[in-house]
Amino acid sequence: PREYQKAAFENWKNNNQKGLFAMATGTGKTITSLNCLYEIYDRKGYYKAIILVPTVTLVNQWEEECRKFRFNNIVKVFSKNPFWQDEIDRICFNEKYQTDDLQSYIIISTYASYSRPKVFEKLNSLDKRRVLLIADEAHNMGAESMAKKLKDIPYARRIGLSATPERQFDESGNAKLRKFFGAEEAYTFEYSMDEAIHGANPVLCKYYYYPHVIRLTDDEMAAYIELSEKISKYFNYDTETFTTKDEILKRLLLARKRIIHKAANKLPAFREIIQKRFEERGNLNYTLVYVPEGLKPDYFGAEDDFDKSDIIGEDVDTDRLINEYTACVLNVDGHVTVRKFVSGQKDREELLRNFATAKVQVLTSMKCLDE
């Protein structure tokens, strides 16, 4: 681990083994938390952890990282593993009847799976003192459907990870989250993007960011104003918070957000950007396009099949948008190679290799770049 990752462990250990780590994307939140688990293993001779993640893709990514630490007894709780219940039953049986406390395991689950009553009850029956709960993208735990379960989660050892732990317009959820992770006064550990790029030992590369401002169409603006007027009725200007978490308000906020997501003038602006880039360079090698979504990404409350929160392409607008942006790239020049890169894609590893060698010059992607 890097020095700042060691510092995170010390802060966590000195905070009764609870903590909320606010770390910039790319600085190694996963490794930082697994280092805490390894330190327990190094001192106690066992590892016991439950890791919660928003999507199925992250379940698999976390498994890969765990194996790099030589953590091998791993159970993935999601629909694509038909044996997970038997594996959990075995762990629970051993926990209950084994006199040896050194049984080691890691259980990786989507939030959607974990929140199901039977799964929630079974996993919470494990060793309360020894299990380390790691919540990836911990802001998901502040969501109303999860926040009401926090009081029933018994694990003494806790780590919350997020580049953005604060939930926008949800001070109640934020307060519950901070209390749960023992970070009511301040984050247990914080490592900002500025420090990661400009600090004494930088770990992230510098980058250029060029905003291109687009305007809403008249129809989009009219719809945006109409929704804003309805939303304003739920807003308390004295406290700068919403007065309710009513489903009607959520739908209004979502509808307004989709107007921005799908703004029609984004496509011609994108066309100008890539055309200029091609004219300047003669190719579009290593171009990664993050297409706006038809639907708001909803990691929580997702099914999982259980949980299809990681699968896109079922929404007509989603298909239309990614197809339009892909066609836009193809129209730049007949020699440009472009592929769609979406969740659930079987050849994604080969596709990434081809992108790295510029066999595929452009990837158009949606949602699977999140988190």
Segments predicted by a language model, with ranges:
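Conserved interdomain linker/interface between the two RecA-like ATPase lobes of SF2 helicase motors
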Residues: 187-283
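Conserved helix/coil segment N-terminal to the catalytic DExD/H
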Residues: 84-129, 143-148, 368
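Post-DEXD/H (motif II) to motif III coupling segment of the RecA-like Helicase ATP-binding lobe
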Residues: 140-204
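Conserved pre-motif I regulatory segment
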Residues: 1-22
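Walker B catalytic acidic pair
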Residues: 136-137
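Conserved Walker A/P-loop ATP-binding site and its immediately adjacent core
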Residues: 30-32, 45-70, 293-295
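Conserved helicase ATPase core of P-loop NTP-dependent helicases/translocases
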Residues: 84-99, 119, 288, 315-330, ...
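Walker A/P-loop
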Residues: 16-38
